[in-house]
């Protein structure tokens, strides 16, 4: 992996969530920060690459706000909110807007087990849908791409996310 990383020019890394197994991080002092992120991605050619982070269901098992707080102290961990967007300039004629979504609050299986997902019920799903609608409507970007933990459509083992097909039909 280090040989590959040494020969590739990377502008940023985008995650699709489940940043920390099995139950997310608990706080800023959680050893998972060091053991599974800081020490793993410490190679000279990748340690300063920005990480644009999405949240997954395993992140909701922990303190997802610790990941937001971590971003305030570590500028390469970018997570200003549970969902957000960022515009990347491709060239003088094109740009790309990536919408980083928090899809876990839309999955009914998780909402029906709040003991496993303590922060999930605090998330305002309608506010995220409204934000998404407004952001896409107002976007002048050449391309808009949404990234989230759960795919709307998938040929993978978990299949489609039916809740997302109903709630986020424009995706």
Positions of the model-derived regions?
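Short, well-ordered alpha-helices that flank and scaffold nucleotide-derived cofactor binding pockets
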Residues: 2-3, 39
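Active-site beta-strand/loop signature of hydrolases that rely on acidic residues for catalysis
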Residues: 1, 9-24, 56, 145, ...
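Active-site clefts of carbohydrate-active enzymes
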Residues: 150-155
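Glycine-rich phosphate-binding loop signature in dinucleotide/nucleotide-binding domains
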Residues: 4-8, 138-141
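Extended active-site neighborhood of metal-dependent phosphoesterases/phosphodiesterases
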Residues: 21-143, 158-170
């Amino acid at each position: 992996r280090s040989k590959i990383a040494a020969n590739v020019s990377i502008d940023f890394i985008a995650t699709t969530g489940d940043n920390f197994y099995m139950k997310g991080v608990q706080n800023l002092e959680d050893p998972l920060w060091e053991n599974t992120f800081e020490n793993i991605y410490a190679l000279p050619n990748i340690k300063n690459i920005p990480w644009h982070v999405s949240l997954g269901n395993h992140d909701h098992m922990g303190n997802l706000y610790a990941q937001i707080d971590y971003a305030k102290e570590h500028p390469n961990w970018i997570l200003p909110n549970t969902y957000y967007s960022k515009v990347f300039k491709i060239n003088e004629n094109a740009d790309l807007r990536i919408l980083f979504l928090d899809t876990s609050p839309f999955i009914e299986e998780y909402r029906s087990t709040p003991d496993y997902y303590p922060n999930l019920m605090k998330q305002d799903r309608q506010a995220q849908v409204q934000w998404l609608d407004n952001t896409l409507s107002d976007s002048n970007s050449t391309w808009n791409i949404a990234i989230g933990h759960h795919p709307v459509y998938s040929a993978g083992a978990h299949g489609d996310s039916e809740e997302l097909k109903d709630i986020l039909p424009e995706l």
